[in-house]
């Protein structure tokens, strides 16, 4: 990470896409995408996804590391080119508990991530706990972030500290996506970014963390990008002009969250304007979902009814029976909720892919279509972009390969934005 930031600050057009997903096919797609390059691949876990208690994936930080490295071994991707990051590390999961308790758990969380070898740490203490005022005073936010940083510094070995980096900042979207529709988005003011840096610097120095300050590479801000279930707010460079100019006076860059579904030209403009770390998550699993739905249509054309995976029916039944991950996000009317379940840009379906019934049905879908030779015309009908790559001999007509390539369509847009080459 430090090398990428140094190159960006020296004037090179370079950024990095942060892959925020725990889905094995997404991680495989990301690693295969850069297998033949020298690029680093940044893969991040969030605190509610992976923590010392297991998170919703059931994985602790060391488990997630092993999970990623096992996929890398299968792919043949060198582990030294993987950067592991932790996102929203702080009291996010424990906001309903008293601050003292939540912070103790947050410190243990940070220690677990650093001990597992994660080298990019987002120190996020912005959320109010049960006995805190709302909103939290910026000084308290910085003070808590400094305590989290201190835990990381005490845990990291000297060798780890050579690669350890921190991200600070509080203006982040709701982890996991917006719960309601959005009309507009507030672009962070330059003076607010400056105040964030100033309060954090003071809090770090108060704890004797001067050396750690040198490891702070980015500030999280809102450049004016967001999405909800049905709409996307696209980047408007002129709105972020002052914010973009201010960061040039620091050794840091910006980290932008919720950059999913922006155009490839927007990613290029964001990196040009020093939003050099671009986080993406739902757009990747949205592409995965599109691929699986397309394959389900192909299966209906090719496979006898009694032998089909019925993946769409299984997904619907599981999500309707277990609505915990989508109920408070989607529209209440049944017909509208079904559209949201299937097609919402916030992609709450991503939480259900590990469900045993859904996982088994997806495996059967892939097995069915691997055994059946996929006709080119059928691929053209449901996956036209992949059909074009098949015609260019860039892709095999296998369901697994088609899914990965569909996910990589998203990564291609980020590569265009983050690379000095525009091909």
From Swiss-Prot:
Pathway: Carbohydrate metabolism; D-tagatose 6-phosphate degradation; D-glyceraldehyde 3-phosphate and glycerone phosphate from D-tagatose 6-phosphate: step 2/2. InterPro entries: Aldolase_TIM (IPR013785), GatZ/KbaZ-like (IPR012062), GatZ_KbaZ_carbometab (IPR050303), TagBP_ald_GatZ (IPR023436). SUPFAM superfamilies: Aldolase (SSF51569). Keywords: Galactitol metabolism. Component of the tagatose-1,6-bisphosphate aldolase GatYZ that is required for full activity and stability of the Y subunit. Could have a chaperone-like function for the proper and stable folding of GatY. When expressed alone, GatZ does not show any aldolase activity. Is involved in the catabolism of galactitol. Belongs to the GatZ/KbaZ family. GatZ subfamily. NCBIfam families: agaZ_gatZ (TIGR02810), PRK15052.1 (NF011626). PANTHER family: D-TAGATOSE-1,6-BISPHOSPHATE ALDOLASE SUBUNIT GATZ, N-ACETYLGALACTOSAMINE PERMEASE II COMPONENT-RELATED. This is D-tagatose-1,6-bisphosphate aldolase subunit GatZ.
């Amino acid at each position: 990470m430090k090398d990428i930031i140094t190159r960006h600050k020296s004037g090179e057009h370079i950024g990095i896409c942060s892959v925020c997903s725990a889905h094995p096919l997404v991680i495989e797609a990301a690693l295969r995408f850069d297998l033949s390059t020298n690029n680093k691949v940044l893969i991040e876990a969030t605190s509610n996804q992976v923590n010392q208690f297991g998170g919703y994936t059931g994985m602790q930080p060391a488990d997630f590391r092993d999970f990623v490295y096992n996929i890398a071994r299968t792919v043949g991707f060198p582990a030294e080119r993987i950067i592991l990051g932790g996102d929203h590390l702080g009291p996010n999961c424990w906001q309903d508990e008293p601050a003292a308790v939540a912070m103790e758990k947050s410190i243990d969380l940070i220690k677990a991530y650093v001990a597992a070898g994660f080298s990019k740490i987002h120190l996020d203490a912005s959320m109010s706990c049960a006995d805190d005022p709302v909103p939290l005073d910026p000084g308290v936010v910085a003070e808590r972030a400094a305590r989290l940083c201190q835990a990381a510094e005490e845990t990291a070995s000297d060798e780890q500290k050579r690669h350890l980096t921190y991200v600070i900042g509080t203006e982040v979207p709701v982890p996991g996506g917006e719960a309601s529709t959005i009309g507009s988005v507030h672009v962070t003011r330059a003076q607010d970014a400056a105040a964030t840096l100033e309060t954090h610097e003071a809090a770090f120095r108060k704890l004797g963390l001067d050396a750690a300050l040198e490891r702070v590479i980015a500030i999280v801000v809102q450049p004016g990008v967001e999405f909800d279930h049905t709409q996307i707010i696209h980047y408007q460079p002129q709105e972020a002009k002052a914010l973009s100019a201010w960061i040039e006076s620091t050794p840091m860059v910006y980290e932008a969250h919720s950059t999913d579904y922006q155009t490839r030209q927007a990613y290029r403009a964001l990196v040009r304007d020093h939003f050099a770390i671009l986080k993406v998550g739902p757009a990747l699993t949205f592409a995965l979902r599109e691929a699986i739905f397309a394959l389900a249509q192909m299966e209906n054309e090719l496979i006898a009814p009694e032998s089909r995976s019925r993946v769409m029916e299984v997904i619907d039944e599981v999500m309707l029976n277990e609505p915990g991950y989508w109920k408070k996000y989607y529209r209440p009317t049944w017909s509208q909720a079904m559209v949201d379940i299937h097609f919402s840009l916030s992609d709450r379906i991503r939480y259900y892919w590990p469900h045993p019934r859904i996982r088994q049905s997806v495996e059967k879908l892939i097995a069915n279509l691997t055994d059946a030779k996929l006709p080119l015309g059928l691929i053209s009908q449901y996956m036209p972009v992949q059909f074009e790559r098949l015609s260019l001999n860039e892709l095999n007509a296998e369901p697994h390969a088609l899914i990965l390539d569909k996910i990589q369509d998203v990564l291609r847009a980020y590569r265009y934005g983050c690379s000095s080459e525009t091909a």
